[in-house]
């Protein structure tokens, strides 16, 4: 069995076959944040909830190491569609779990023609009151 076949067997998201998106969740949940960041284009952008854009693989890796140590993502279903310039938009819904809460999430990915993540936005799907209770104090 090839590693791609093994990945598909172990980590599936209904409607999604893009390896970079599957690997994003696999490496994120394994705490392999350097590997997660390596899935991004050199100038890739991550937009986490309550944060400004984080630009570049190094900055994304630093952010993930600081903020995602105890978070598990449970993607459920997704859809992919071709955009202009050979890019692909992938939307995935699921849950994110911390030690103290679980929240519904929408992950939006834009993949470039090399199938690297050029942009991802993580959007919490919760009521305004739920979101206020989740916001970290700075």
Where are these regions (language model features)?
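Generic alpha-helical structural signal
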Residues: 18, 22, 58-61, 65
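A beta-strand edge to alpha-helix "cap/lid" segment located at domain peripheries
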Residues: 2-9, 61-138
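Short, low-complexity N-terminal intrinsically disordered segments enriched in polar/charged residues
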Residues: 1-30, 34, 38, 137-138
């Amino acid at each position: 069995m090839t590693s791609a076949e093994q990945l598909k067997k172990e980590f599936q998201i209904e409607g999604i076959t893009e390896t970079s998106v599957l690997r994003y969740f696999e490496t994120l949940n394994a705490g392999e944040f350097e590997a997660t960041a390596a899935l991004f284009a050199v100038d890739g952008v991550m937009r986490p909830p309550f944060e400004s854009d984080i630009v570049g693989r190094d900055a994304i890796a630093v952010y993930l190491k600081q903020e995602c140590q105890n978070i598990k993502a449970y993607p459920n279903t997704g859809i992919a569609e071709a955009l202009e310039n050979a890019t692909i938009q992938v939307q995935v819904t699921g849950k994110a779990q911390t030690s103290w809460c679980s929240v519904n999430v929408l992950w939006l990915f834009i993949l470039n023609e090399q199938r690297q993540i050029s942009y991802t936005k993580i959007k919490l799907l919760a009521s305004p009151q739920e979101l206020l209770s989740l916001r970290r104090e700075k």
